[in-house]
């Protein structure tokens, strides 16, 4: 089967300051929580980043409860100003271990809650995997925040970067409880930056092959 | 002649399979990831593939799950018609094995009941069990834990027969494209063609159990698998969705006869953590 690979470097450029969006990972950037605006401003879609410090693990049900507290005007169990939420529901720890496998879950399920959390708490970052809604991307630009992806399915590898794990709220939710995690050099990639850069879109522009080879639509005994 | 298999044996076997399937990534998948690493041109894609291989090695060495989403316990039974199960009810024995395997194996419990506004059942039961009665006096058990992230990106459609092979291809590509980075590519794409509404979904799921690198025995279907794989890998999604040539490691198609009025097609998306282990008792 013959098809053409496009030449490298076809990612679209625009006047956006994120001029190296979608570029291959070069040197890792190191960041430590809590994040100041200047740190977020330095991150561009496609950057590989090592995160250290305290981050918070929360997913579906914990998000629902956090936003319900905001709706009622009550205080959250944790101050999220400048912080990062990691979308993860870890596996249980073996005895003597800090945590079980702890890779990212699909972020899109948190989209209905995220813009509200960012606006109300000063949350600066999220780690997960997969697409975000346009509302979330707008919130990142409006409030200078960033969305990272960790490698989905690399839960055992990621667990090695987690040095401390504590349930700080909602223990009844089991794997969905709100956890505090202390991480060291957790490897993530910037997907959506605070300038509107979007690695997933840029990646498709760079690597998709428009001339999809034509199928030989010969006789198929099983389908005809 | 009947052969007796006890519920205790079955429970023990299922518990072991739950642990093994979750800790040890199959040799076929590891081989496919290594092959993908050699072909991937995107640096970020290569980085993801390297992390996945390293992750599999860590999981096996430390006996921790490859992925924290240790999934719904999907259990396939091929029950010989000459087997008699003693000491209780077969499905209770399977669920006891899941309970034991997930609890003692430090695997995540992800089942919630009732489905709307329910609570975690606490032991990852109930399993989803598919039983096939086959000739003979053996019982083959396959445990295939299935994560939520990739399952959520799966889809089925009832095409008109006139849509033909082109319609099938378009639906598969559209499903993979729409899924994008969400189901943790590189993927294994299971496709069921034919049967009826529920049959095509089961075919798609069973397609995921076939070892990677093993084409469908019918040449026409094997050709469709190759073509679909090539088209999927033109999408550019790449490992992790970070861009690249390797969006899928394999496409497996299974087929069944269909009604004259329908062409059902199901696409079951599987992430690289393609877990399934079998035993024959």
Question: Where do the protein language model's features map onto the residues?
Answer:
Chain A
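Short, well-ordered loop/turn sites that connect or cap secondary structure elements
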Residues: 43-44, 49
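Short, charged beta-turn/beta-strand-edge "cap" motif at the junction between a beta-strand
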Residues: 48, 54-58, 194
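Short, structured beta-strand/loop micro-motifs enriched in basic residues and often containing a Trp
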Residues: 26-35
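Feature captures the catalytic cores and cofactor-binding loops of soluble hydro-lyases/lyases
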Residues: 57-186, 223-224
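Active-site/ligand-binding-proximal alpha/beta "capping" segment
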Residues: 114-115, 191-224
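Short, surface-exposed secondary-structure edge patches
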Residues: 37-42
């Amino acid at each position: 089967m013959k098809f053409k690979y496009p030449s490298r470097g076809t990612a679209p450029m625009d006047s956006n300051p994120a001029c190296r969006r979608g570029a291959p990972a070069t040197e890792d950037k190191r960041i430590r929580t809590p994040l100041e605006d200047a740190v977020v401003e330095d991150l561009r879609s496609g950057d590989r980043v090592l995160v250290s410090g305290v981050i918070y693990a929360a997913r579906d049900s914990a998000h629902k409860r956090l936003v319900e507290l905001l709706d009622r005007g009550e205080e959250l169990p944790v101050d999220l100003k400048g912080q990062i939420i990691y979308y993860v529901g870890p596996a249980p720890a073996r005895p003597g271990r800090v945590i079980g496998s702890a890779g990212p879950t699909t972020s899109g399920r948190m989209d209905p809650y995220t813009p509200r959390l960012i606006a109300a708490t000063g949350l600066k970052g999220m780690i997960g995997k997969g697409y975000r809604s346009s509302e979330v991307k707008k919130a990142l630009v409006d409030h200078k925040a960033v969305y990272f992806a960790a490698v989905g399915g690399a839960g055992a590898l990621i667990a090695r970067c987690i040095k401390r794990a504590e349930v700080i709220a909602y223990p009844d939710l089991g794997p969905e409880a709100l956890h505090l995690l202390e991480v060291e050099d957790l490897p993530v990639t910037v997907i959506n930056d605070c300038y509107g850069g979007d690695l997933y879109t840029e990646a498709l522009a760079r690597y998709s092959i428009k001339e999809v080879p034509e199928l030989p639509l010969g006789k198929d005994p099983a389908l005809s | 002649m009947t052969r007796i298999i006890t519920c205790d044996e079955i429970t023990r076997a299922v518990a072991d399979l739950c642990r093994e399937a979750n800790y040890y990534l199959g040799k076929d998948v590891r081989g496919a990831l290594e092959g993908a690493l050699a072909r991937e041109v995107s640096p970020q894609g290569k980085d993801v593939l390297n992390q996945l291989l390293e992750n599999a090695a860590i999981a096996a060495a430390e006996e921790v799950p490859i992925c924290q989403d240790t999934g719904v316990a999907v259990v396939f039974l091929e029950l010989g018609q000459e087997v008699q199960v003693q000491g209780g009810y077969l499905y209770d024995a399977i669920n006891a094995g899941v309970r034991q395997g997930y609890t003692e194996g430090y695997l995540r419990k992800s089942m919630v009941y009732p489905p709307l506004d329910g609570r975690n059942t606490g032991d990852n039961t109930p399993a989803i069990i598919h039983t096939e009665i086959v000739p003979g006096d053996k019982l083959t058990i396959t445990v295939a834990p299935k994560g939520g992230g990739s399952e959520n990106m799966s889809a089925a459609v009832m095409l008109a027969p006139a849509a033909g092979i082109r319609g099938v291809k378009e639906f598969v590509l559209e499903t993979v494209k729409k899924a994008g980075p969400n189901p943790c590519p590189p993927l294994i794409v299971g496709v069921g063609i034919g049967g009826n509404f529920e049959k095509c979904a089961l075919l798609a799921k069973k397609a995921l159990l076939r070892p990677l690198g093993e084409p469908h025995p019918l040449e026409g279907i094997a050709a469709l698998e190759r073509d679909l794989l090539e088209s999927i890998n033109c999408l550019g999604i790449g490992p992790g969705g970070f861009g690249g040539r390797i969006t899928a490691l394999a496409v497996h198609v299974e087929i069944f006869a269909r009604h004259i009025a329908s062409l059902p097609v199901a696409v079951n998306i599987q992430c690289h953590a393609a877990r399934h282990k079998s035993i024959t008792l």
